Regions:
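N-terminal secretory signal peptides that target proteins for export/translocation
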Residues: 1-11
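Conserved serine DD-peptidase/penicillin-binding transpeptidase domain
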Residues: 49, 98-382, 498-504
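Small-residue-rich helix-loop
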Residues: 72-74, 324, 349-504
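Short active-site loop at a secondary-structure junction
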Residues: 74-94, 98
Length: 504
């Protein structure tokens, strides 16, 4: 590979670093992208760490001291990478800025003459318990509004009470606040029934998944399966077996027939008879209808029989009977960032579009609103990167370490955003996606960062508060490897660890 642009600087060691890194981490054919700079000690330390790892991948790094805005390390910082879930950093900051921290999501139930309406508001964390509470409210309301029939019999007025709930023929589902496109641009077609690939709908419950509780049965017999919710919306074929030894042991699989877009699940494989109960989450096809079916079943247990569940807009004359409002969006963002929830990310993007443009929320208008914010407020040149979804699942996303450092620096310097934004991050060695990474015995050190993982992609961006109290923003993006991600995560952790003790 020929490099036509020579590295600047008088230090011969920097030239060595550049030649070494070009050899080890060939990131692009564009020669202008190869650029390394920073403090000599940091350059030495990180170069040694990278060399000792023996790993080969496309790599971009940038580290900035936030109080001085000084770059203390940079390698290939303007090159574009698929950021995976580091994309959620854009979504999180935009949600705080555009929706404001007190914004809530509403799910409502209405009634007209012969129908109930369940209206979704894009709540990413609506639970089965909250839906059941609304069903109980509807049941109680119906009992307070009983109808009465009067007639004459033997010259006396007779009266009987009629439960009007029994006359309800339809439960109508309105998810029209957002469009009905279930998958993001650039999502892989074969993600299947995994939790992280749940379809997107304005009417979502239980993360658009069914929980499967798996317990060993009698040896030689199928394992015991319970689900939450218990619903006729799905069917289960249980071909599994409880075993007492590991000979010919087959891993348990719970698979939905997603190719045919059904909600038929097949369970195969083995469970040891000594195993504890385990929980599996699998997504469903058509989450709007799933939510409606489960709600109708909840109503039925309370004596309200629904004959048909269909999708249609809310009738203008319908009367609101019940409403659930979510916690403020800043609470949703903490759970979203720490658990890296893809469904929440995409619902936020579409909801931002609906709020910003006062129309049906879509990926197009939501992402446009976010990019306008990033360009006009954060100062990112949105012509230099590609934002295709809110979660980072899309293979069309491209960002650089430079983009993330601008974002992280702006958020840190914004007095309104900073504390709320920083509180959403996983904490190194403490919780969620970083609970077993970057453990540091020095209590003065704090590392908060967002991970990003796809096949061949491992990224880490966030903040370091060093032993001296210096705040750093960093972004490490890695693309283009074919083996497991763990060695590359370990390399990221070593780089971050070296940065915690730097003396500027």
């Amino acid at each position: 590979m020929s490099i036509t642009k020579k590295p600047k600087g008088k230090n011969i060691l920097i030239c060595y670093h550049l030649l070494f890194l070009i050899f080890l981490f060939s990131c692009s054919k564009a020669p202008t992208l190869f650029h390394v700079k920073g403090h000599k000690k940091v350059l030495d330390d990180i170069t040694i760490i990278i060399q000792e790892s023996g790993l080969q991948t496309n790599l971009g790094i940038k580290v900035v001291e936030l109080e001085s805005d000084e770059t203390i390390y940079e390698w290939n910082a303007q090159a574009l990478f698929n950021p995976a879930s580091n994309n959620k950093l854009y979504t999180c900051i935009a949600a705080l800025a555009i929706l404001d921290s007190n914004h809530t999501f509403s799910t409502s139930v209405y009634q007209d003459t012969a129908a109930l309406y369940l209206v979704g508001g894009g709540d990413p964390h609506l639970t089965l318990e909250q839906l059941d509470t609304m069903a109980r409210t509807i049941s109680d309301t119906m009992k307070l509004h009983l109808g009465r029939d009067y007639w004459f019999q033997n010259n006396r007025v007779r009266m009987r009470t009629i439960d009007r709930a029994k006359k309800l023929n339809y439960l109508i589902l309105d998810d029209s606040i957002l469009d009905d496109v279930p998958y993001g641009p650039g999502w892989m077609w074969d993600e299947g029934s995994w939790w992280y690939a749940a379809q997107i709908s304005a009417l979502s419950i239980n993360e658009n998944c069914v929980d499967f509780y798996v317990t060993p049965g009698i040896t030689g017999q199928p394992v015991l399966i319970q689900t939450n919710p218990v619903t006729d919306f799905i069917s289960i074929t249980n071909q599994s077996k409880t075993v007492n030894d590991t000979a010919n042991f087959k891993e348990l699989k719970i698979e939905r027939d997603w190719k045919k877009q059904t909600n038929s699940f097949t369970i195969t494989g083995n469970v040891m008879d000594t195993a504890s109960t385990d929980t599996f989450q699998r997504n469903v096809h058509d989450p709007t209808l799933y939510s409606g079916t489960v709600f109708a079943e909840m109503l039925q247990t309370r004596g309200i029989n629904i004959n048909h569940v269909i999708k249609a807009p809310l009738s203008p004359g319908a009367i609101k009977l019940a409403e659930h409002r979510s916690r403020p969006v800043n609470h949703a963002l903490t759970e979203f960032m720490k658990r890296s929830e893809n469904l929440t990310a995409e619902l936020l993007v579409k909801h931002i579009g609906a709020v910003f443009y006062d129309t049906v929320g879509t990926w197009n208008n939501g992402l446009l609103a976010i990019k306008l914010f990033l360009h006009d407020t954060v100062g990112i040149d949105t012509n230099t990167f590609r934002l295709s979804d809110g979660s980072g699942v899309s293979r069309y996303n491209y960002s650089s370490p430079e983009h993330f450092i601008k974002l992280l620096t702006w958020a840190y310097n914004d007095k309104v955003i900073r504390d709320q934004f920083l509180s959403t991050f996983p904490i190194g060695g403490w919780d969620s996606t970083l609970d077993d990474r970057m453990k540091n015995e020095d209590s003065t050190v704090k590392i908060i960062a967002k991970t990003g993982t796809l096949s061949g992609v491992s990224c880490l961006s966030g903040y370091i508060f060093t032993t001296r109290g210096d705040p750093l923003a960093f972004s490490i993006l890695m693309n283009g490897y074919v083996n497991e991600a763990k060695p590359f995560r370990n390399l990221q952790d070593r780089i971050v660890s070296a940065l915690t003790d730097i003396k500027l």
